[in-house]
């Protein structure tokens, strides 16, 4: 099983909470296994959105999970950072207030926290 790097809740905005998780992957099957592993934790299984992007040897994949455009935000940040053979998952628990365009900034903030963690280590 692929080892997950789960940073937990890294920020909140107007009641919504965001967490970020990632793992090394080399195939779509690996991505699916990581998502399944993450969702074995009840909080993540019940999250409003688990958006993700992956850079694989065969190309890029992404999924918005109802948070339109969020997968592309994650993917572009991964591509700019040169992060390959990886999946990054940004989880949101909706807090009752719509965030509008700020939701993309929060996805960026969560993704940046993960990328920074990879650069600096635990």
Where in the sequence are the language-model features?
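Short, contiguous clusters of charged residues that form electrostatic/catalytic patches at enzyme active sites
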Residues: 72, 76
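Active-site-proximal loop/helix of nucleotide/amide-processing enzymes and allied scaffolds
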Residues: 69-71, 84, 92-122
